[in-house]
């Protein structure tokens, strides 16, 4: 959506009904809100996602800086990541699906998928390309010239920019960040 009021109402829903508290949670669940609405329109019942896939490969900035060079730290990072439903907004995505009576299939959080790669180090998974352990089986992907990992909300989707600007324009034109506005929505200051 591009209409400011529709974006703001969606943000309010994600904060008040789904329980999003962080800026990244709002931005990451924003497209799922509309995807689920389209699924309902067309009679879809099950949402299959790739959410949390990057956790297996340690492609976040934090993981690449702090865990990619030490095998034990990398393994511990992934064990912690996948033992916490807050990772990758999974808990909130589950709630959004429940509220809309959509079944969620999130295979990257399944123990069978976790066990595939937990004993591999960062280099084994990501050299010479990110996610090499998978990509080597799909040479047709090479033609797509896939760029290195970019967070969904920060890449060319412009979700963070569009959502942030909508709430800033509605509530506080001189704000540099939407975080304070999100907090006020959560507290009920902005109805």
Where are these regions (language model features)?
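ATP-dependent adenylate-handling ligase core
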Residues: 1-39, 58, 62-72, 121-125
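Mid-to-C-terminal catalytic subdomains of enzymes
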Residues: 47, 52-72, 84-175
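A broad, structural surface signal
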Residues: 37, 41, 115, 136-139, ...
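Acidic, carboxylate-rich catalytic segments that either coordinate divalent cations
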Residues: 172-191
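PAS-family sensory domain signal
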Residues: 78-82
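A structural signal for alpha-helix termini and helix-coil/disorder junctions
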Residues: 17-20, 140, 188-191
């Amino acid at each position: 959506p591009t209409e400011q009021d529709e974006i703001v109402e969606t943000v309010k829903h994600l904060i008040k009904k789904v329980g999003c508290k962080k800026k990244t949670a709002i931005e990451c669940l924003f497209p799922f809100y509309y995807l689920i609405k389209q699924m309902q329109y067309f009679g879809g019942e099950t949402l299959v996602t790739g959410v949390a896939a990057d956790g297996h490969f340690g492609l976040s900035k934090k993981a690449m800086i702090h865990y990619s060079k030490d095998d034990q730290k990398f393994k511990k990072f992934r064990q912690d990541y996948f033992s916490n439903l807050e990772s990758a907004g999974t808990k909130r995505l589950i709630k959004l699906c429940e509220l809309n009576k959509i079944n969620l299939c999130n295979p990257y959080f399944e123990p069978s998928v976790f066990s595939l790669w937990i004993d591999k180090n960062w280099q084994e998974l990501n050299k010479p390309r990110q996610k090499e352990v998978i990509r080597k089986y799909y040479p047709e992907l090479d033609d797509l010239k896939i760029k290195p990992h970019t967070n969904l909300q920060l890449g060319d989707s412009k979700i963070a920019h569009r959502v942030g600007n909508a709430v800033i324009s509605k509530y506080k034109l001189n704000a540099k960040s939407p975080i304070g506005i999100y907090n006020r929505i959560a507290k009920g200051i902005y109805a």
